[in-house]
From Swiss-Prot:
Single GO BP term: DNA-templated transcription
Reaction(s) catalysed by this chain's protein: RNA(n) + a ribonucleoside 5'-triphosphate = RNA(n+1) + diphosphate
Transmembrane regions: none
Alphabetical keyword list: DNA-directed RNA polymerase, Nucleotidyltransferase, Transcription, Transferase
Quaternary structure and partners: The RNAP catalytic core consists of 2 alpha, 1 beta, 1 beta' and 1 omega subunit. When a sigma factor is associated with the core the holoenzyme is formed, which can initiate transcription.
Function: DNA-dependent RNA polymerase catalyzes the transcription of DNA into RNA using the four ribonucleoside triphosphates as substrates.
Entry EC no(s): 2.7.7.6
Name of the protein this chain belongs to: DNA-directed RNA polymerase subunit beta
Family matches, as Pfam families: RNA_pol_Rpb2_1, RNA_pol_Rpb2_2, RNA_pol_Rpb2_3, RNA_pol_Rpb2_45, RNA_pol_Rpb2_6, RNA_pol_Rpb2_7
Annotated source species: Burkholderia lata (strain ATCC 17760 / DSM 23089 / LMG 22485 / NCIMB 9086 / R18194 / 383)
Gene name in the database record: rpoB
């Protein structure tokens, strides 16, 4: 088994019973693949597939002018390299994007050419099409300096859907069937039955019309319509009565209205008897061809065809007319014998289309189209061209209607056609096929569709959403281009004169900047990033709205299995509308979610893995991943638990066709991180999944001792860690960068064999948490491609580490853990276990005002030197300064208008020429309730404005850092080159050289070492080939130097050019403060099982309950939090965590007494290979075993995968191994070793009962009391009511509401009440009066009229009622 460099340092013992069949796919693949398909940036223009940008361009181009003599054709597009890299964009507040240029060709035809068109001239040119945001390697976008994510959308797939109203519309509870054809873009077409069984259609939810109007509009006559939907009965008229052609099926179940006889006149069915199968057999046996029917049997039947008098050509009766006595009379007169009527019955052949034809008043195709025109454009006169154009545009024009590849596939599958491709617009037979199925449904044949089935909902990813926006922009451009194309020839225009890129840029900018699906990335920790990118939302444009979404849409559906997580979804109004992709889910070419299954052939599980969509899955019998199989892959059990079409059942192995790949396949990333998930209630698991995303990265991340084995995948795929791009040797490492000398076999010829990784240091995330990377390799380490070189936020040795492992005791403690409160030891705070660093960004801008420019300066009047003490000469705070609320960070003055001066001021001015009062102090200060350390300052200056010293110094530092990188690369390149050179030169014969090298001398190592490296090139060699090689190496080194100099120059140019700032801004300063947040009462904490609580008290270490060996518990939780919540997973985690730590202590004890390596190996083998997944410890060297043991001292990390975790027996074994009987006895453990005797820290007495004690991975959540605590003295007031504002952000007050007033009234506290409602709130004069009185030392309240009363009076007056206050 292969272990990576980091895995060897600390192996996670897995309890999984099943081998890994299928690796978890790259977790951000959906986003990255979708966007790369959209851009196709690295594909040659000629080889691009018709998708993404290419599809958008080809669908709009060529654009032809109105007269048809000029057209603009699309040739290809290209994306330039981005001007700034990701980091620079974040710092400068820019969008990380690249310029999109399209090569277009303007073709002008010769108007004079008499016959076929002749090309007169062709102009080709590259045209700028706007900026296209680029995706970062981690699947996000940088828009205006902030990272955003485009969330995928789950929407109803295009195609045709059949449903009924579940009997809700009509009072009788009758099912009304309907069908809807949904295109990808274009008009929706609905068909629906009304309670009277008449079939209507409507376009885009407008007024409904009989469906036969649509059928006539597509060119069918009433005869053809009836022929399409009915079978006919054939009658031959006799002088009296008629003969009916006998069709057995049509008679079965009917009641005979007359005696039915055979040819000989023998009665087979008596009148008023129901015709059964025996009667039919008798009739068939008698070879009955016709049945004689009486006259009244014909009456009321409906004619299928027009009946025309052969001699006169007169229409006697039309199709769909009822047969009456007069009609029969006319027919006999005209000598017509054969007539056809519609066969209908009440059971499975309803007369719906026939009834609809009767309601329809239109007569022919034109009238039908006019009726549709009137419905679509009421009030407009229907001219012939307009009517035709509108109808064709509705469903037949490719510009206006697009069913899309998916829609066509879904449509054809639903109407049972074999081929899944076809035209992208609606065809006449599509409309007919839909109506036929709908009528069949009404007749009781077939099933309606389930719209929540994942086969009917598809995912639109970034690429597709961006393509739709881009196409919308292009269509806007198309209209403008059409106008101008007419003038292209006369005014000699070039392509760039025709195309204006503004509409495209604005469409793209709007989508990425403010669409509902473009969201501010949740960056609290690596898990929240991954989850955000894997989110699937049913909301957004073209999706559902919160208010309208019912229970069904939100509910878990059987087809979610392995595609969408049934657990992870937000609590609240969005529940079930926002979901997360399951671990192995993947999108197929049509955008439907697929999940992998192992193929089973003859009850033997093969290694073949097939991805099945929800529709395909319904056809197979699928076994669960935990079905027992032997070593040959044969299913052992007589009955296997399996699923077919969403139903679970027990079946014999020979019926199984597929099997799940992994037990964790049904849940999402966050849910699969919860150990013992199978023992938690689903509601609590949902909270646990959601709260892990809110865990704040701790100062020192600590791996969970009980994990699920997916922690490493999460950390690596999130992009928080640094991975080796190529293998090699670590050449240099410090806190800020890692330099790797690449292996020769991985280095590319002519390229620097050096990889430099600059680590991210103390950077602010979107949620103000700290992102910081720490190297975990040492100089000289050999690393392979993909190894973890540095840990990021919330990762420990390349594993996700969201919280800390706490020693937890389940017991009550003086009521301090009442109602989920948490009691914590002071030691936890003192050790900085939950201390987190938060980085705040504070901005100040100097603008150009009407009165003159604002100035950033240290020279501010009326400020004491103490307040300016932390500013440098430019007026900007030093890095490293510790600041409190109200301290000045950046000094800034703003000019203010001339004010009326007092005589004293005039005198002072005359004497001293004092001009200071022209400016007011608008410095940037630390906001209230914040304090911290300044860790970074950035200064941005507009082009053409003198930089201050500080800005210059920042640029110099940046260049120095860059030069260091380049020097390192050069050092390694030269080192390699000179090593190769030395190997080549030693032993060669020289013709001369420096230090008087004689001709014919053999060069040796000593001579070379004596020379300066660069003088080696002056040696003249006798061997011409070697001399040429020497020259080549010299050239390659010089070439590299030249390249590095160019790169440095490029960087310098980028840094020294002015910054792009918003209009009117001259200078902008950003100050970054690092705020250290210790754990304190009021902070919210949680485990991974939805067991959340608030810290109630931090107890001195000596008061905490402690074990017999003196070790105190870290956290005391209430045992009552477990039973009713049904999240027993937390108790199991505590037991297993206790074993993990116990094993760690035993390993630590071995290391302390310097036990033999062999003893260590035996013990580690016992831990790793007695149960669960086997580890290959044989391949480890003694040094590696020693390093592994050192890392295991703090606890042997366990993995208990979801639904495949540790059993009770295995946990017992581990506890026995961790706590031998002597230790167990000393600690007073129970026989199963999961409960311990504890002593009260305050009295030293032993508690009456043993206590469940162990280690749990506990998180601190991003709901910190510091961010929520707030107190107001005097602050802003609302403009109209003059009442204080509310909320911390507005520095608002506390609302004193209706009920609080009642409380004071109840106590009769009249003065308190008066004060609350007047001077403390909105009595403007009273407020100032109280202030004056307080200054004078007089504590009297003069309450006046509250402003809200005046507002009330004004509002009543606005109703036209004259109301006035009688002040007497």
């Amino acid at each position: 088994m292969q272990y990576s460099f980091t895995e060897k340092k600390r192996i996670r013992k897995s309890f999984a019973k099943r081998p890994i069949v299928h690796q978890v796919p790259f977790l951000l693949a959906t986003q990255l693949e979708s966007f790369s398909t959209f851009l196709q940036a690295d594909v040659l223009a000629a080889q691009r597939k018709p998708e993404g940008l290419q599809a958008a361009f080809t669908s709009v181009f060529p654009i032809v002018s109105h007269n048809g003599f000029a057209r603009l054709e699309f040739v290809s597009y290209a994306l330039s390299a981005p001007a700034f890299n990701i980091k620079e964009c974040q710092q400068r507040g820019l969008t990380y994007c690249s310029a999109l240029r399209a090569k277009v060709r303007l073709v002008i035809l010769d108007k004079e050419s008499p016959n076929k068109p002749v090309v007169k001239e062709v102009k080709e040119q590259e045209v700028y099409m706007g900026e296209m945001p680029l995706m970062t390697p981690t699947g996000s976008f940088v828009i205006n300096g902030t990272e955003r994510v485009i969330v995928s959308q789950l929407h109803r797939s295009p195609g045709v859907f059949f449903e009924h109203d579940k009997g809700k519309t009509h009072s009788s509870g009758k099912l009304l069937f309907s069908a809807r054809i949904i295109p990808y873009r274009g008009s929706w077409l609905d068909f629906e039955f009304d309670p009277k069984d008449i079939l209507y259609f409507r376009v885009d939810r407008r007024r409904k019309m009989p469906v036969t109007i649509l059928l006539k509009a597509i060119g069918l006559t009433p005869e053809q319509i009836l022929a399409n939907f009915f079978v006919f009965d054939n009658f031959t008229l006799m002088d009296e009565g008629a003969q009916l052609e006998f069709v057995p099926e049509r008679l079965r179940g009917e009641v005979a209205r007359f005696d039915i006889t055979d040819r000989d006149g023998k009665v087979i069915v008596q009148k008023d008897k129901r015709i059964n199968a025996k009667h039919i057999r008798d009739l068939e046996a008698a070879k009955t061809k016709f049945i004689s029917v009486p006259e009244d049997y014909l009456l009321g039947r409906v004619l299928a065809k027009n009946v025309v008098d052969g001699d006169t050509g007169e229409v006697i009766a039309s199709a769909n007319d009822e047969v009456t006595e007069s009609v029969l009379e006319k027919l006999r007169e005209a000598g017509i014998k054969d007539i056809q009527t519609l066969y209908t019955n009440d059971l499975d052949q309803g007369p719906y289309i026939s009834s609809t034809l009767r309601v329809d008043e239109t007569t022919d195709r034109t009238a039908a189209r006019i009726a549709i025109y009137r419905m679509m454009r009421p009030g407009e006169p229907p001219t012939e061209e307009a009517v035709e154009a509108l109808f064709n545009r509705l469903f037949y024009s490719e510009e206006a209607y697009d069913l899309s590849k998916v829609g066509r596939m879904k449509f054809n599958r639903r109407v049972s056609r074999d081929e899944i491709t076809g035209p992208m617009t609606l065809q006449d037979d599509d409309i007919l096929a839909t109506i036929k199925i709908l009528v069949e449904l009404r007749n009781g044949k077939g099933e309606v569709d389930d719209i929540d089935h994942l086969g009917n909902r598809r995912v639109r990813c970034v690429g597709e959403l961006a393509e739709n926006q881009f196409r919308a922009g292009l269509v806007r451009v198309e209209r403008a281009v059409k106008e101008r194309l007419g003038q292209a020839e006369s005014e000699n225009l070039m392509p760039h004169d025709l195309i204006n890129s503004k509409p495209i840029s604005s469409a793209i900018r709007e989508f990425f900047g403010s669409s509902q699906l473009s969201q501010f990335m949740d960056q609290t920790n690596p898990l929240s990033e991954i989850t955000h990118k894997r989110r699937v939302s049913a909301l957004g444009p073209g999706g559902l709205t919160r208010e309208r979404a019912g229970f069904e849409v939100r509910d878990v559906h059987p087809t979610h299995y392995g595609r969408v997580c049934p657990i992870e979804t937000p609590e609240g109004p969005n529940i079930g509308l926002i979901n997360s992709l399951a671990l192995y889910a993947h999108l197929n070419e049509y955008g439907f979610l697929e999940t992998p299954y192992r193929k089973v052939v003859d009850s033997k599980v093969t290694d073949q893995i097939d991805y099945l969509s929800a529709i395909e899955e319904g056809r197979y019998m699928i076994a669960q991943a935990n079905a027992a199989i032997d070593e040959n892959g044969q299913l052992i059990d007589e009955l296997v638990s399996s699923r077919e079409a969403g139903e679970t059942m027990m079946v014999t192995p020979d019926r199984i066709q597929y099997m799940d790949v992994a037990p964790s396949q049904i849940v999402s990333v966050a849910a699969s991180l919860i150990p013992f998930l199978e023992h938690d209630d689903a509601n609590r698991a949902l909270m646990g999944s959601n709260m892990q995303r809110q865990a704040v990265p701790c100062l020192r991340p600590e791996k969970p001792v009980v994990g699920t084995g997916i922690e490493r995948t999460c950390a690596v795929d999130s992009g928080t860690t640094v991975q080796a791009f190529r293998g090699g040797v670590v050449d240099y490492v410090d806190a800020g960068r890692i330099v790797i000398r690449v292996n020769d076999d991985e280095a590319v010829a002519g390229e620097v064999g050096v990889d430099i990784y600059n680590l991210i240091k103390y950077t602010r995330s979107n949620q103000n948490t700290n992102i910081n990377q720490r190297p975990i390799v040492k100089m000289g380490d050999k690393v392979s491609r993909g190894d973890v070189l540095a840990d990021g936020a919330s990762t420990d040795l390349g594993e996700l580490a969201l919280g800390q492992n706490m020693l937890i005791a389940f017991m009550p403690w003086n009521g301090y853990n009442f109602e989920d409160s948490i009691l914590i030891s002071e030691k936890v705070v003192a050790d900085d276990r939950y201390t987190s660093i938060h980085i705040e960004e504070l901005n100040v801008v100097a603008r150009d005002t009407k009165l003159g420019p604002e100035e950033i300066t240290r020279d501010i009047s009326n400020l004491a030197e103490v307040q300016l003490g932390r500013l440098d000469e430019s007026g900007i705070v030093y890095i490293g300064a510790e600041v409190e609320a109200g301290d000045v960070l950046v000094g800034k003055v703003t000019p203010k208008g001339e004010t009326q001066l007092t005589p004293e001021e005039k005198l002072l001015r005359a004497i001293f020429g004092e001009k200071a009062s022209d400016v007011k102090d608008t410095s940037l200060r630390v906001p209230s309730g914040m304090s911290g350390t300044v860790i970074d300052v950035q200064v941005f200056t507009r082009e053409g404005i003198q930089r201050d010293k500080r800005a210059q110094q920042i640029i110099d530092d940046e260049l120095k850092r860059y030069r260091l990188d380049l020097n390192d690369q050069l050092r390694i390149v030269e080192g390699d080159a000179f090593q190769r050179l030395a190997r080549m030169l030693v032993g060669k014969v020289a013709n001369g050289g420096p230090k008087k090298l004689a001709k014919g001398t053999k060069i040796d190592q000593a001579y070379l070492e004596d020379l300066d490296h660069y003088h080696w090139f002056d040696i003249r060699l006798a061997d011409d080939e070697a001399a040429a090689q020497l020259e080549a190496i010299k050239n390659s080194i010089e070439e590299k130097r030249h390249q590095f100099d160019l790169a440095f120059e490029e960087k310098r140019k980028k840094l020294t050019q002015g910054d792009e700032l918003p209009p009117g801004v001259l200078k902008m300063v950003k100050v970054y403060l690092a705020v250290k947040r210790r754990l304190q009462p009021g902070d919210k904490m949680a485990g991974r099982h939805g067991n959340k609580g608030v810290v109630s008290k931090i107890v001195p270490i000596e008061d905490m309950p402690y074990m017999a060996d003196g070790r105190p518990a870290d956290v005391v939780l209430n045992p009552l939090g477990v039973p009713s919540r049904m999240n027993v997973g937390q108790v199991l985690e505590v037991h297993l965590g206790w074993a993990a730590k116990g094993l760690g202590w035993r390993i630590g004890e071995m290391l302390q007494r310097q036990a033999k390596i062999e003893e260590m190996r035996v013990f580690l083998t016992k831990i790793y290979n007695d149960s669960g997944r086997q580890e290959d410890l044989e391949s480890f060297t003694d040094e590696e075993i020693l390093e592994l043991a050192k890392n295991l001292r703090e606890g042997v990390p366990f993995a208990t995968p979801v639904f495949d975790g540790a059993t009770e027996e295995e946990m017992g074994k581990m506890l026995d191994l961790a706590f031998p009987d002597d230790i167990a006895e000393q600690l007073g453990m129970n026989p199963s070793k999961n409960q311990v005797r504890l002593y009260d820290g305050r009295t030293g007495e032993m508690f009456e009962r043993r206590v469940t004690l162990g280690y749990m991975h506990y998180l601190k959540l991003h709901h910190l009391v510091d961010d929520k605590m707030h107190a107001r003295s005097t602050g802003p007031y609302s403009l109209v009511t003059q009442q204080p504002l509310g909320g911390k952000a507005q520095f608002g007050g506390q609302r004193f509401g209706e009920m609080e007033v009642w409380a004071l009234e109840a106590y009769g506290a009249s003065y308190v009440l008066q004060e609350m409602l007047t001077v403390k709130s909105d009595d403007v004069n009273g407020r100032t009066k109280v202030y004056e009185n307080l200054v004078k030392g007089d504590h009297v309240i003069d309450a006046g009229m509250p402003e809200s009363f005046n507002v009330l009076v004004k509002e009543i007056r606005s109703l036209g009622i004259d109301i006035d206050l009688d002040r007497n």
